[in-house]
From Swiss-Prot:
GO terms for cellular component: extracellular matrix; extracellular region. This is Phytosulfokines 2. Residues 23-77, 83-87 form a propeptide. It comes from the Eukaryota. Promotes plant cell differentiation, organogenesis and somatic embryogenesis as well as cell proliferation. Residues 1-22 form the signal peptide. Induction: Up-regulated by fungal infection. Sulfation is important for activity and for the binding to a putative membrane receptor. PSK-beta is an enzymatic derivative of PSK-alpha. Expressed in stems, roots and leaves. Its main location: secreted. GO terms for biological process: cell differentiation; cell population proliferation.
Length: 87
């Protein structure tokens, strides 16, 4: 009985180490030493969003995917900007 429990323990340890090494590394690694400024991050994100909106897609009448994307962007923009105070 002791051999079975020892074998199961070794198998469990082996499986756990294999699971840790099989996990893919994160695509984006953020340094902990870099302090993130929330105001600066918001400006960067808004700048990237503005750059994305600069590219205007011309959708044809038959391009249903394009129309769906534009509708989704419009709804998302409305949802996230309706509470902002406009100057």
């Amino acid at each position: 009985m002791a051999n079975v429990s020892a074998l199961l323990t070794i198998a469990l340890l082996l499986c756990s180490t294999l699971m840790c090494t099989a996990r893919p590394e994160p695509a984006i690694s953020i340094s902990i030493t870099t302090a993130a400024d929330p105001c600066n991050m918001e400006k960067k994100i808004e700048g990237k969003l503005d750059d994305m909106h600069m590219v205007d897609e011309n959708c044809g009448a038959d391009d249903e995917d394009c129309l769906m994307r534009r509708t989704l962007v419009a709804h998302t923009d409305y949802i996230y900007t309706q509470k902002k105070k406009h100057p």
